[in-house]
Amino acid sequence: MVRKAGLIVNDGKELAVQTAISVQKKLEKSNYEVVRVSSSGGMVGFANPDQHVRPLGYSNCVPEGFDSSMEFAIVLGGDGTVLSAARQTAPAKIPILTINTGHLGFLAEAYLSNLEEAIDKLIIGKWDIEERKSLIISVMRNEQRRWESLCLNEMALHREPLTSMCHFEISIGRHAPVDISADGVILSTPTGSTAYSLSAGGPVITPDCPVVQLTPIAPHSLASRALVFNDSEPVTVFPATPERLVMVVDGNAGCYVWPEDRVLIRKSKHSVKFIRLEDHEFFQVLRNKLGWGLPHVGKPNK
């Protein structure tokens, strides 16, 4: 019986392309039909940020052949490739094995040094699934949905370039609206709490927490601090700035947002399914990849 697997590759990186060739051969020898696609299919909007419309919504990012018959997809690239691949697989409920051929690889499960072992475990089914929550980001004008994307990490909204103050009115569920003056705002998932939001002063959140966090970028008030709230509450961001803003989703999707637009952020029904070949303790991952909680090697003498 022929089984089906996907291969999502960062075609802009020679190392990822060469690795994909060997991985595809190995899968085909194990009687897999392999559907290979470029990770660029999950990048939405940046080629022409004025062109908002995704007529079929975020599910339009799912490549042809990626369906319920696919056992898994292997992602070859860095963290940006993984974020793009999430949009290509989550709506189809396809689990992904992330193999790092980039730099940090915070979202990577395996590396080139243990590639053969990882593929062997994958083929024999020696793996589990960890589900990560995602968001749906929509740009609305009146009742028209002008742009939409799935988001695994964060949505950032700011001026272009990021040089001057913006004003936002933000509505969270039934709570009173929040007014923020800052260089921009970030709405992130727990997965995204270790990315842009962390650099902007937001807290680290463990991946299993059902929350969203709002983090101002360089706020112009001591009262503006990161806010964490339940992910069941929809968020609407109203730009109160006369110039257009730039919205960036997961670092590789985005569009312009005009004063007459609003940005709607809501919990997605589609989680991103990560294949885990071994148990990962989250604090240990923080320690290994971000240096969190490391002991002081040398302390000053008294």
UniProtKB/Swiss-Prot annotation:
Its main location: cytoplasm. Involved in the regulation of the intracellular balance of NAD and NADP, and is a key enzyme in the biosynthesis of NADP. Catalyzes specifically the phosphorylation on 2'-hydroxyl of the adenosine moiety of NAD to yield NADP. It comes from Prochlorococcus marinus subsp. pastoris (strain CCMP1986 / NIES-2087 / MED4). Belongs to the NAD kinase family. One of its GO terms (cellular component) is cytoplasm. GO terms for biological process: NAD metabolic process; NADP biosynthetic process. The gene is nadK2. This is NAD kinase 2. GO terms for molecular function: ATP binding; metal ion binding; NAD binding; NAD+ kinase activity.
